[in-house]
Amino acid sequence: QLRPDFYSRTCPSVFNIIKNVIVDELQTDPRIAASILRLHFHDCFVRGCDASILLDTSKSFRTEKDAAPNVNSARGFNVIDRMKTALERACPRTVSCADILTIASQISVLLSGGPSWAVPLGRRDSVEAFFDLANTALPSPFFTLAQLKKAFADVGLNRPSDLVALSGGHTFGRARCLFVTARLYNFNGTNRPDPTLNPSYLADLRRLCPRNGNGTVLVNFDVMTPNTFDNQFYTNLRNGKGLIQSDQELFSTPGADTIPLVNLYSSNTLSFFGAFADAMIRMGNLRPLTGTQGEIRQNCRVVNSR
């Protein structure tokens, strides 16, 4: 039902309008591309890509922004608002917030050095948010490989390449120390660091995230090319330099079927880019609202007045 040319007649400028906002925002905020990609991911894992993550709390539901995986970390909402405002001027009541977030993710990846792909479009926006589901459906940075696979399979992403390629979104962006500290000092209650951590990387991370330090300090996922979308993430995993446990598990879980994919993507950028684009399309197609389902929100933060 979704198709890349969905807006070719009704809003042909949609891609340019979204791109111009991202280009402008990147000048002052080099993190914004990674932040937008993460918003899309956190949207799609909770009842499909329906822009439910963008809704603020109302009298009928609590916002997903308050859920543990999003609170104090999901960001970029104001940038989506900028895109929506510009699109409402150019093509009123035409482009859904769900499609804005999907297109913005693709352009964010492309502008950061990553692949391009034709984004299937025609999603509509949900009229409710799913706070409880956001707390349970999103993968945790402390997950083992088995838990990660289950979280992905639960939403319909059941190929090893879905998990390994989408994890490569951590080739840019940052995480807070509070998601890393346990690995550095007391991994799984052992009073020792995670044995998969490269010793020099461990020393670097301990400097950035001291034992009783400020958990809100931000650390780059990829120390080599922190704002570039490339395959360095996988090389880092092979060298024991994955920042969060759930990423390192892809390579360090003995006998895992994800290891050959980490090796492949590390040695071949085109293989990674192709797999990432494919997995993004698969994720973007999860349970979309189409036709007369949902609505086209006029303000991405609130449901249209009835």
UniProtKB/Swiss-Prot annotation:
Disulfide bonds join 11-91, 44-49, 97-300, 177-209. Substrate binds at residue 139. CDD domains: secretory_peroxidase (cd00693). The modification Pyrrolidone carboxylic acid is found at residue 1. It catalyses: 2 a phenolic donor + H2O2 = 2 a phenolic radical donor + 2 H2O. The active site is at residue 42. Keywords: Calcium, Disulfide bond, Glycoprotein, Heme, Hydrogen peroxide, Iron, Metal-binding, Oxidoreductase, Peroxidase, Pyrrolidone carboxylic acid. One of its GO terms (biological process) is hydrogen peroxide catabolic process. One of its GO terms (molecular function) is heme binding. Binds 2 calcium ions per subunit. Binds 1 heme b (iron(II)-protoporphyrin IX) group per subunit. Gene3D superfamilies: 1.10.520.10, Peroxidase, domain 2 (1.10.420.10). InterPro entries: Haem_peroxidase, Haem_peroxidase_sf, Peroxidase_pln, Peroxidases_AS, Peroxidases_heam-ligand_BS, Secretory_peroxidase. Pfam families: peroxidase. This is Peroxidase E5.
